[in-house]
Amino acid sequence: MSKVIGIDLGTTNSAVAVLEGGQPKIITNPEGARTTPSVVSFKNGEIQVGEVAKRQAITNPDTIASIKRHIGEAGYKVTVGDKSYTPQEVSAMILQYIKKFAEDYLGEEVTEAVITVPAYFNDSQRQATKDAGKIAGLDVKRIINEPTASALAYGLDKTETDEKVLVYDLGGGTFDVSVLELGDGVFQVLSTNGDTRLGGDDFDEAIMNWLVENFKSDNGIDLSKDKMAMQRLKDAAEKAKKDLSGVSSTQISLPFISAGENGPLHLEMTLSRTEFDRLTSDLVDRTKAPVMNALKDAGLDANEIDKVILNGGSTRIPAVQEAVKNWTGKEPDHSINPDEAVALGAAVQGGVISGDVKDVVLLDVTPLSLGIETMGGVFTKLIDRNTTIPTSKAQTFSTAADNQPAVDIHVLQGERPMAADNKTLGRFQLTDIPAAPRGVPQIEVKFDIDKNGIVNVSAKDLGTNKEQKITIKSNSGLSDEEIDRMMKEAQENEEADTKRKEEVDLKNDVDQLIFQTDKTLKELEGKVSDEELQKAKDAKEELVKAQQENNLEDMKTKRDALSEIVQELTVKLYQQAQEAQQAAGGAEGNATDAKTDDGTVDGDFEEVKDDKE
């Protein structure tokens, strides 16, 4: 069975891991980095992903970052040139890139993956993530929650201990907190909570706003109107945030950020950790309520938690660590890398699926309550939040009017009492209900949630046994046909990228061969026949002509022909050099012999003794 890779598809950075020898291992990207920026750029018809895309964000407007914030969002598209892309397609480009370098590392095709999502992702966002995997050519065997994955990475070697663990996960764009119970190889999620609109990007933005305000105050120029300046500010803000995790103040220096009446203007400011904490205190405070709610839903007090695990790059911020310590009364555990834990845990789950990991059971929960709209616009819950999945629940309803021929089933997810305030997952209709007074027909509505947290709903008329089912699709509205089309386009893009690389490699080979041929022909002058030299020159000219015409097939043929001729001539030159060396060696040997025969002088000697002795 091929390997099941674990992918942490993050807002700002992504990572991939695989199980080797019973232990999860991060797979480095082509640049040698253990995480890959979740950034995609489009340039000259080429799609670039990762660090190379992030580096050109300042100068290339066709660069997309933090697309995860919009996954599952109805109608959201990014326009690049004359083409529009859904968040699933952009995410698929990142996944495709990760899949490719994972295959290069493993030396085999990768078709199966476990992909992580924020614990507080709703059904639409989970389904959209699964669709992105499918577009990228991956069979997504399981969608698991990020905090749960971290706990898997943490607890893999601790299956004999019983612990209650709180995972605080503050990533680039989302925040989650989960409470789990670990024991005897069972990882049971007791509760989960979070905020899918809060993350490290917001901390960066707080610094950016501070820089914009101060620069405007000093120079009267609003940098927020300058797109290129704002990208430079974003990069500087991110760097300053990271610096302040280790130092008490940092210098932000951006020369030529703008221009005034008297010439260029430079941004030079010092940001202290104290000021940074003041700017972001409201963001840190926003994470407190989800922590307390998760503890409450788990039926635990903070002092009953054995371990606190920090996950996500933003948990390196000292104020965040201090806040978590104050709220839980526990010093956070730093035994796992917050940037890598999620991918490592996903790889462990991949090992469970492939059978490489035994005696580990993962029991996750649904993050939000599920139900339907009933009379008066009320949201009636069928499955409460933090119910262990997979699960199934049925409830019987009836008609609201006499002789009602059909019922509309409006499926919702959320915690608010009124249907209008919750997230619509889908609608469907059960028709052909026999005429009967109000309240007589018995309509059974059944919810099924699978292990990925994806919802199936059915409605059945118990009188006629007529049934209607719906698998809740992502509200982004991607049909199976659209997903298939996007998969085909993704494969074509990959093929086009491969072809483009082959073209570049061919042109580089040709340039190098022409240069090498010119050099070799100069060395061969007077050492091989004129006919042989002319043959090589003619072959070179034919290759130059094919190069100028950009005829790729002709270039391949002419390159191979010239390469063969040059190789033959080089071998000949080498043989000549060897023969000359041997001849020179023989002549030197003769000269030495002659000296021995003619130049040796025999002489007598006598011992001279010291007379003073």
Swiss-Prot record:
Induction of expression: By heat shock as well as salt or ethanol stress.
Chain segments annotated as transmembrane: none
InterPro entries found in the cross-reference section: ATPase_NBD (IPR043129), Chaperone_DnaK (IPR012725), Heat_shock_70_CS (IPR018181), HSP70_C_sf (IPR029048), HSP70_peptide-bd_sf (IPR029047), Hsp_70_fam (IPR013126)
Biased composition (Acidic residues): 599-613
Annotated segments matching region Disordered: 577-613
Keywords: ATP-binding, Chaperone, Nucleotide-binding, Phosphoprotein, Stress response
Molecular function per GO: ATP binding; ATP-dependent protein folding chaperone; unfolded protein binding
Sites bearing Phosphothreonine, chain numbering: T174
Gene3D superfamilies linked: 1.20.1270.10, 3.30.420.40, Actin, Chain A, domain 4, Substrate Binding Domain Of DNAk, Chain A, domain 1
Presence of the UniProt keyword Phosphoprotein in the record: yes
Pfam families: HSP70
Family under the similarity heading: Belongs to the heat shock protein 70 family.
Functional summary from the UniProt entry: Acts as a chaperone.
Name recorded for this polypeptide: Chaperone protein DnaK
Organism: Latilactobacillus sakei
Gene that encodes it: dnaK
